[in-house]
A protein has these predicted regions:
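Conserved helicase/translocase motor-coupling segment
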Residues: 1-59
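C-terminal accessory regions
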Residues: 61-173
């Protein structure tokens, strides 16, 4: 099944980082039979987090670790391309059992699971909920707190960003 857990935030108990560790432990635990290196296990779902033009893999590409030894690992991406990473390139990868709503933009999944908890109060906004829900083609599973859901639905205020873009463009014209 094409399923993805999305979280509004990286931190907190229901954030990307903590949930990735929890799901790795539950779905693909470290065992004597399962090769492991630098916190990654053979079979882990991983995401490339920076562009690498020499390897032709880009920020947001998701794959699965298919081989590990003491100095390198191989990730198979969805287009059946195998990419080898040496130990000094491991920082270009992160677990992808869970990803942020922001990282999921532009992607679609059959099923999306979205934890909504009050600890994410700063990110509980209607537009973020809309983005997460519209990543799902068939099914959305909301897990958590009804109050957090109601907060997100009723909060249509987005943070105002001060980029100075207009001023910078005016200077160039």
């Amino acid at each position: 099944m094409d399923m993805q857990v999305l979280s509004p935030m990286r931190r907190e108990a229901c954030g990307v980082d903590a949930l990735n560790r929890t799901l790795q432990e539950a779905l693909n635990p470290e065992t004597e039979d399962n090769a492991s290196i630098a916190g990654f296990h053979s079979g882990d779902k991983v995401m490339q987090i920076r562009n690498d033009y020499t390897k032709n893999v880009f920020n947001g590409d998701v794959g699965r670790i298919v081989w590990i030894d003491t100095e390198k690992l191989i990730v198979q991406y969805t287009d059946d391309v195998d990419i080898t990473y040496t130990r000094d390139e491991f920082a270009s990868l992160t677990l992808a059992y869970v990803m942020s709503v922001h990282k999921s933009q532009g992607s679609e999944y059959s099923t999306v699971i979205l934890p909504l908890v009050r600890a994410h109060h700063i990110m509980l906004q209607r537009n973020l909920l809309y983005t997460a829900v519209t990543r799902a083609k068939k099914r959305v599973i909301l897990v958590g707190d009804r109050i957090a859901l109601f907060t997100a639905v009723s909060n249509d205020r987005t943070r105002r960003r001060y980029t100075l873009l207009a001023e910078r463009l005016a200077e160039r014209i």
